Amino acid sequence: MHNLENKNASNKKPKKIVVSDLIAILTYLMEIKNKMTNKELWKIRHICLTGSYNNNQMSIMKILMNKFPKTINVPFDKQNNTYLHQSIFNRHKIFVDFFMNELNDNINYRSKNKIGISHLHALVNYGYIDHIETAIIKDPGAIQQLSDDGQNILEFAVIPCFSIISNKNSEPYKKSNTTIINIIKTLSKSITKLDLQSRNKMGYRAIECAVRYCSTDVIDELISLGFSINESRLKNRIFPTINNNDLIGFATQIDRLDMVKHLINIGAPIHMYHINKHNKLLVPTCLVVAIKFKRDQCIHYLLNLPESIQALSNNTIKKYLFNIATNAGCTNHEIISKLCPKTYDDKKLRKNCNRYKISVFEQHENKIERNIKNYYKRRFMILDSISNMLSILCSIYNFSDNDSDLHKITRTVVSLEANLLLKYTTINNVYETVADFVDHIELTDIQYCFETVSNSEIMKASDCIINEYFISMKKLGIFKKINRLIKSKNIINTLLNEFDSDSESTDDDSDTKRACSCGCQSCYDSDEDPVCDSNESDNSNDINNHVKSDNKLNSSNDYYDEDDSEDNYNNQSDDEPLVKNDVVNTINTITPNQNLENTFNENNVMINNINFEKTLNNKHQSFQDNICENISENISEKIPNNNRDNNCNNNHNNNIQGDKELFDKPLHLQYTRLTKLHEHYIHKSLYKLRHPIKLNQYDTVYNLLTSLDPYVKNNNNILVFNSDNKLIAKIFSLSIKSDTDYINDINSENDNVNMYHEKTKLQIRSKPSRWIRFYSQNICGLDKQDPNHMFPFVLDRILNDWPCIERRIRDKIHPDGLDSLLYFYGELLINGEMIRGCFEYFINSNNSVFHRLFREEYKLPQNIRDTLDESINVLSY
């Protein structure tokens, strides 16, 4: 048939074929065929199951099924859908009736498509009551089968129908509440008992789905079936309400006042929340949810309940609810007047309204999408994983020597690992996302923290050893940005808490996404590549593992697993330059096995027998296993005796002994690894080189910024090596007298009084007042590609916090700003010799670098040379 169509298409005037002749030809072809290919099955599906129905389509399908009845269970598209799947999803009732009546003995009702929906699940979801009864009579055990998302048969009965239709002109099918009740009654007649307490991978049951999508009559039917609504909460938490046995709180969250009233009338418990585990202050969780999500009608109703009246009699609880209302942006004066404590005035009211802008949430979600593929299709699980990682980091920072803190950290780690086992994301993606939130690209900090707290042997060690580990973790660079971590944690928790509310819509597409726990409508589109890829054989194991991990968490003795409060920390500046030391991953190597042997002469320094251990990144190994491949290389360098005054020569001779002590210490060789976040920052910093026209040197600068040059950085100096492990640059530390001038300059940035006189003087500072954010168009131009201009670009990442000589002058383009001229004292390998001088940077008030040059010492301005002479304790010469 396929060849016949192609032959006809190639002719200019194809011969018209009568439909009856086509059926006869197809019948003949079927008689001589021994098997059908997937392409042929898909072609017949395209002819029969799309478009409007006619008798010819049924004739073709009957011819196929009479010859090959087993093809009813054969998947033919990328989503592994069968003909029965497609007939149900497209609501071709005549084909469904034909398959169920004529091929009932050949149908495997447990056959799943690629997203884990079986034939019986599809029949129940679309409300084919007569055929449901036929199916459960033939295969009673199929009623207990779960989907790949852990959904049981009752959930498919109450959730909306999946909008998986090929005919775009058709309206999505909606089951009536009467149909849902009849389906539940039909399923209850099965000889196989239904598991009423089964929870899907999101942690909720069928009754929670009914609270969201169905009427109160469906709730009554489920309760008569045996569902319990009097279960206690799993944790002393407010959010999430959907998987914490808080039906009233969940109904309040989705703003279903009719369901709230009905649940209270039939005896559903109003759960009380301990606002602090150290006291007995209780508040209804549904009231907190209603205030947080601004459900005004529910608030008015809940405020009249006896539990709410008793709670509001306490001024502490009143203040707690008032803070939630102001932060949520409540503008209802009647509600505010009932919640406002008597001691509050207008000033305190304004102070408590510290809400985040919508753009802040959008920025965080954009960063998540940049690091995690298909984020919006699996929002809940990914947000939950990121929230757990941020909670781990904040708990490490706040760790004190007690069992409860350690238990909380361990429990959070278990929860994070359970989420990651669901294959919705990877641990490396979470690392990169958290690092992106705080502009900290040193992923090994986060990796080291997680590897440490997830190591059961370390967590079971003595208190002294555990404290040492936590002290070492608190010294990592990631915790210098603790304010950003806490802010990001609060933002992610807000997104997580409002996930169900945000997705609530009357649109059927949104209902469809929520019907599938992964929210992945494209999973059902037969014309797209599938996203969810779960093996049917592994389905039960994954679900059992998930349930076991949930039970471990639920059986914890620590019931008071409170919602994370906003901890207060000292305000500190989190602004960091765009191109900086931590734009790349750095991993410290093990101490070299051999000591460093130094040979010093009067006028030169020889360095021999350095044994480095190079760190390579291996995604399939843990952090401890990443250290491998020992590289032994003889590195020699010779420093010439340049002309310099006697004072500096004496200083050089006095520092030889200090050099010996420096090189006798273990060297920590740091290697770089290109990451997605690295590429993002590099690409952003080169904006001026590609807009509006891409310059010729763009690729050169990009390659230099992403070069993998190793370096060694300690308190005294920086050593930079090339790819052959040869020393090519040194930067020495300078003695710092005081940073008072530096602080004064920062505080008086926009002060125009005597600005020129005060800012032009030279100062030795502990770090530059500003650093590189963008590269200007003249960097690496045709006349700036000599060795002096092309010194290692890795220094642009690691000098942002290094002592330097700085001169600040008025910005001619922006008169209110100040430009910085920076000098870093060191040596550079030029023509095989180490030349002493200064690495010079010129950075304007907008943090754009216009000039980077290594200037030999004899070419330095006299005032720079005099300042260098005044600096004491140059560690290496």
Swiss-Prot record:
Keyword Repeat: yes
Signal peptide: none
Region feature (Disordered): 525-579
SUPFAM superfamilies recorded: Ankyrin repeat (SSF48403)
Keywords: ANK repeat, Repeat
Low complexity composition-biased segments: 533-544
Ranges occupied by ANK repeats: 44-74, 79-109, 115-145, 202-231, 243-272, 282-311
Name this polypeptide is given: Putative ankyrin repeat protein R748
